[in-house]
Swiss-Prot record:
Superkingdom of the source species: Bacteria
Transmembrane segments: 8-28
HAMAP family named in the record: ATP_synth_b_bprime (MF_01398)
The family this protein is said to belong to: Belongs to the ATPase B chain family.
Keyword list, A-Z: ATP synthesis, Cell inner membrane, Cell membrane, CF(0), Hydrogen ion transport, Ion transport, Membrane, Transmembrane, Transmembrane helix, Transport
Pfam families named in the record: ATP-synt_B
Chain's role: F(1)F(0) ATP synthase produces ATP from ADP in the presence of a proton or sodium gradient. F-type ATPases consist of two structural domains, F(1) containing the extramembraneous catalytic core and F(0) containing the membrane proton channel, linked together by a central stalk and a peripheral stalk. During catalysis, ATP synthesis in the catalytic domain of F(1) is coupled via a rotary mechanism of the central stalk subunits to proton translocation. Component of the F(0) channel, it forms part of the peripheral stalk, linking F(1) to F(0).
InterPro entries in UniProt: ATP_synth_b/b'su_bac/chlpt (IPR002146), ATP_synthase_B_chain (IPR050059)
Subcellular location: Cell inner membrane
Organism: Rhodopseudomonas palustris (strain BisB18)
GO terms under cellular component: plasma membrane; proton-transporting ATP synthase complex
The name this protein goes by in its record: ATP synthase subunit b 1
Length: 164
């Protein structure tokens, strides 16, 4: 028996058993288990929180993607509407320009026709005056007296009425 008591392993085993007994007497195992349980609960809570945050992030991502898609659709609609509006305004401006040009052309043609008519009238008037003057000169040189005066007046009236 002295051989076993002289071995250090024996005394280590005895010290271990005594230490375990003291730990059991003071309830150290309960404290260790309680600490481990608390750690387990804390880790589980952190994992649950991480899962909840992950789901929340996924929901926010889906919402962001939906909003982005909606914004892109709305932007496309606005662009299409702006293009349609620009085309409508361009067509309207073209129609107004064509109408303006047509009215200006008609006005210019009317002024040209009026100027032509005035020029023709002026030429006729000048021709009539020249013919009257020529007839007066010829008649006054060829015919003398009261007869010449009557013929001259009648001739002038006739020429004026025909030329004007």
């Amino acid at each position: 028996m002295t051989g076993i008591l002289a071995e250090p392993e024996t005394w280590v085993a005895v010290a271990f058993v005594i230490l375990m007994g003291v730990f059991a007497y003071f309830g150290v195992h309960r404290t260790v288990l309680k600490s481990l349980d608390n750690r387990r609960d804390r880790i589980k809570a952190e994992l649950d929180e991480a899962a909840r945050l992950k789901e929340e992030a996924a929901a926010l991502l889906a919402e962001y993607k939906a909003r982005r898609a909606s914004a892109e659709r709305e932007a496309q609609e606005i662009i299409a509407g702006a293009k349609d509006e620009a085309e409508r305004i361009a067509a309207e401006a073209k129609a107004k320009l064509e109408d303006f040009v047509a009215r200006r052309t008609k006005t210019a043609e009317g002024k040209i026709a009026l100027a032509e008519a005035q020029a023709v009238a002026d030429v006729r008037s000048a021709a009539a005056n020249a013919a009257v003057a020529a007839a007066s000169t010829i008649l006054s040189q060829s015919v003398k007296g009261q007869v010449a005066e009557g013929l001259l007046q009648r001739g002038i009236e006739e020429v004026r009425s025909k030329l004007n």
